[in-house]
Structure formats: structure tokens, C-alpha cells
Amino acid sequence: MKSKILNFKDRYGPWALIAGASEGIGAAFSEALAQRGLNLILVARRENLLSELALGLRSRHEIEVVEHALDLGNMSSVRDLVSSTNQDIGLLVYNAAYSPIGYFKDVPYADLENIISVNIQTPLFLIKALSEAMIERGKGGVILMSSLSGIQGSPKIATYAASKSFNTMLAEGLWHELKDLNVDVLACVAGAVRTPGYMTSANEKDAPGTLDPHEVVAETLAALGSSPTVTPGSFNRFAKFIMSRLLPRKRAIRIMHNNTKDLQ
């Protein structure tokens, strides 16, 4: 196990940047990567949660932790982050997402624009900016968090789901483009996860297939370097197969609406 951790640190270190780090899956990624000895750049909006997370990580692990509290939907702030960062970043984890809930006719256009900014524009920019050094060094990795909502149309979260489909397709294409350059790209196509956001919005807190964040992170890190996508949890893999391969599209969309109609 120790040699695997050392190999992971050598391949994806010395620094990892985690966008959307403050809680849930992002915090679980932070803990798992700290256990593997990577120094961390933590990015999220809420400074108090970031500071609390960083304090705990420093106390439990012999690593460096840098915090940046900023809005990942603000491209000026994101550009400033990249230009001011001089650490050797070997791994990018993009976990941040904006997901307003509501039928398209009821969602303000400003919210739709923010979905594009946070879920598409910023990860594109960060991948482009950070992968150049990874390619030059001949090693590195990118993890994009995606969602089962993006494998078919998802009423009530239609634009968010479309952005997650984009994330998956981008990761798959980049996986092929960059694998021979020793840069590993992976999309985690997750189902329901017990994050603070999910527990607030979901009507059914323990739906079949719901996972804890650390379970999602463990399966994702295990898949990095061996596959373009991973769907944590056997139930979720089965559901993905049924929804994407067996059911007619209209039926899959109706089933998805049954799952999303009670979101708040």
C-alpha cells in the first residue's frame, strides 16, 4: 500500500488543485489526496469552510495547504488564481458545480449563464491552463466530476444535466488525446451522494445507490489512469446501463423526471 501511495504522489504530485473543495466530495478528495502526501490548493466560495478544512488537513498530515476563497463563476478571479499560482500542479480535481433546481421556464437566465460559467467555462480554462505543464513534465491527471443526470435529458435540472454531459464527453475525448502524453483524464459519473447540497434538496435522503463522499472518491482515485470514466457503486453502474443502453430515450427521460420532480 505504501508503494502505491508513493507512486501516486510521484505521478500526480507534488500539488493538487481541488476546485469546489470546501465540503462533501471536494472535502473527501482533499482528505484522500492528503493521505497520499500531495500538497493541496483548495478553492471554493466559502472562506470559513475552507479555513476549517485546511486547518484539519494540516493537523492530520505533513503537507502544505493553500486556500483561495473565490467565485468559480467569475472568470477574472479564476484567471488571477492561475496567474498567481507558482506551485507544480500535477492533479486537477474539478468538483465545483452550480445546479439551480426548477423547470426551464422558471429559471432566470442569469442562473443559466452561471451554470455555463461554473460547470463548463471554468473547468475548460483550468484544464487548458494547467495541462500544459503536465504535458511538458510527461505526467499528471485531471478528474472532472460528472453526473448520471447527464446520460439523458433530466427535467427540472435540464441545463445542469446538459453541462454534466459536456463534462463527460470532454473527459472522454481528452483521455484519448492525452493518454500517450502520460496525462490521465477521468470523468466520475456519480449518482446520488450524501453531500450537504444533496441532503438539503433531495426528498428521499437514502434512495437506492446513494453513496457517501468517501466511497465516491475511493472508486474514482482507483480508476484514475485506467479508464476514461467511472461510475461509483454497483447499483449506479447497473442503473446507468439500463438508462443508457436498454430503455428507449423517452422512457429514460420520464424515469429521470420521477427522480427529479420532488427536488427543492
Predicted regions and their residues:
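Substrate-binding pocket helix/loop in short-chain dehydrogenase/reductase
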Residues: 103-104, 108-116
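C-terminal helical subdomain
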Residues: 187, 203-241
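Conserved glycine-rich cofactor-binding loop
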Residues: 15, 20-23
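Conserved glycine-rich Rossmann-like NAD(P)H-binding loop of the short-chain dehydrogenase/reductase
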Residues: 36-53
